[in-house]
Amino acid sequence: IDKNGNTCIHSGEMSLGIWTAIQGLCCAAGGNLLADVGVPQAMVEGFENTEGALGDRLIAAMQSGLNAGGEAGPLHSAGLLIVDTHGWPYAELRCDWTEDCPILMIAQAWKVYKPQANDYVTRALNPTDAPSYGVPGDE
């Protein structure tokens, strides 16, 4: 997805299981080893029909994909990466392995991180202007 919202999707011929992809308005979704060919369409609809911050919309897309069948096998991991205007991720949340729902774990982490995200950007760009978090060493 470029800065104008244009999308492009490519996967090689060796994709495993059910593979499909779809482009939406300022979004794209695709996957392999899917339980159903409609999973990416559900993800695009989840993204496009959700208002709010990009993280909220991406999590809604992941949840919509899961509700549409998700992966053919058990889901153990998920991640959320948001890149903004700087040379580092605005948000990078991961769940590398769980027996529970990793999308729920990402959503819970986003709920905690989202209100603080801009403060971390401020801390990186101009630490003296950043709010104090009240942790040892940050009085």
For the regions a protein language model found, what residue spans apply to each?
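N-terminal nucleophile
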Residues: 1-139
